[in-house]
Amino acid sequence: MDAATAPKQAWLPWSPLLFLLLLPGGSISSCPTVCDCTSQTRAVFCAHRRLDTIPGGLPLDTELLDLSGNRLWGLQRGMLSRLGQLQELDLSYNQLSTLEPGAFHGLQSLLTLRLQGNRLRIVGPGIFSGLTALTLLDLRLNQIVLFLDGAFSELGSLQQLEVGDNHLVFVAPGAFAGLAKLSTITLERCNLSTVPGLALAQLPALVALRLRELDIERLPAGALRGLGQLKELEIHHWPSLEALDPGSLVGLNLSSLAITRCNLSSVPFQALHHLSFLRILDLSQNPISAIPARRLSPLVRLQELRLSGACLTSIAAHAFHGLTAFHLLDVADNALQTLEETAFPSPDKLVTLRLSGNPLTCDCRLLWLLRLRRRLDFGTSPPACAGPQHVQGKSLREFSDILPPGHFTCKPALIRKSGPRWVIAEEGGHAVFSCSGDGDPAPTVSWMRPQGAWLGRVGRVRVLEDGTLEIRSVQLRDRGAYVCVVSNVAGNDSLRTWLEVIQVEPPNGTLSDPNITMPGIPGPFFLDSRGVAMVLAVGFLPFLTSVTLCFGLIALWSKGKGRVKHHMTFDFVAPRPSGDKNSGGNRVTAKLF
């Protein structure tokens, strides 16, 4: 070893230690004693350490900092400004009540900020300044009551905002201004009484909107009109929502709509009819009792319908006709006794059918389901029979391909009991026809009027729930034959009855229409041919009697005068000519005939 190299070799073993000592404070080699650090992931974990201030000496290249579950009460401006590489900051479940404007200044790389479970009350402008790269902000479980105008104006990269479980009562119209990339927002368990439509209209890139557990009674027409890019809308647990206004979804072009655990009593067809691109519809846990025929046909691209945990008792034939892409139906946990093949446009295209939890009657109406049982996805619980008794509790998957006699059969409908086949009623009276039938499954009763039209459940002439035909305020035009038809899936039977109507004249003897009356105003006077004949008779008979009486009196008078002379003589005095002064008078004799 020469003198030139000796000094160099002497300090080389100490060079790494010297390098670390010369690094500025807070490098990755340092870690606060109250925290745990990992150099591989550049993460610092200081959660649940009862800290009331942010510890010093944090590594400058930290990318994840977890300070959750401590006692932090506030953040001052620039407190974290040295952590320029920080990407995720968790401040959840502290006691933060104030965030000074500029508190996050210098965190230009931060992507995720979690502030849930604190005591924040008002979010105003400037609080989140400097967070130009932030994509997720979680403000749940605070005490926030107001979002002021411009509260998030500097978060131009924000894509997801969570603000549930707050005391939120008002969202200023410009609160969400500047959130040009926000794609998802969740408002849940707040005190909002209306949907903040004006504020939401400031979100041009919003794709998913979740409105959960809100005490809002209605979604007014046009409330979400400005959200043309919205694809997913979730309305969950609005106990006061009983119906959707027809125009409540106007302006939307949704592909997924969920209105669950509300109080809808029927499918809101009028509000849905324009959603031609809707693929998924979830109306589960609503008191909906029926799906009528063809009302879903405007939703031509609908693929999935979920209506589990509702009150469904019937799904009509042709209920899903017009839905050429339909492949999933979830109606588990309802009150359905059957599901007929005719409800679907093409049962073979059905992939998933959730039907468990229904009191199914395993008769001929479910033979199609038995045929497809090995191909269909029934989920974790396949449907089971609730009746007849000999198959009660048996899953559809347990049946063999060759059925024993008496399994999955039906009996055609037959009329067993009916009232009089000929009924006579007075005009303005009341007429009733009874009709019932037997069969398996139990048949339905329908009535056809004389003109050939089927009668409904409402109106002056209506069919009651028990199949009875009731005609109130009988009119002359109600006269004719009425046909009772009892039918089920196995067949039908019919019975012809007749109604005869007796016309009743008003007390004043006129034949005016008794149906046209107004209090205090006399109605118009109309006569039919019989009335005209009566009027003519009443006028002609007195006239004829008077003329006959006159001629009779004249005849009696003439007989009282004796023999009648048939000639008479009278003098005729002609004009005297000017030249004849002695001419006398002329006598003329005329005969009376």
Swiss-Prot record:
Top-level division of the source organism's lineage: Eukaryota
Cellular compartment(s): Membrane
Positions bearing carbohydrate: 191, 253, 263, 492, 508, 515
Domain LRRCT: 358-412
Domain LRRNT: 30-60
Main location as per UniProt: membrane
Protein name (Swiss-Prot/TrEMBL): Leucine-rich repeat and immunoglobulin-like domain containing-NOGO receptor-interacting protein 4
Organism whose genome encodes this protein: Mus musculus
Lineage of the species this protein comes from: Eukaryota, Metazoa, Chordata, Craniata, Vertebrata
Gene: Lingo4
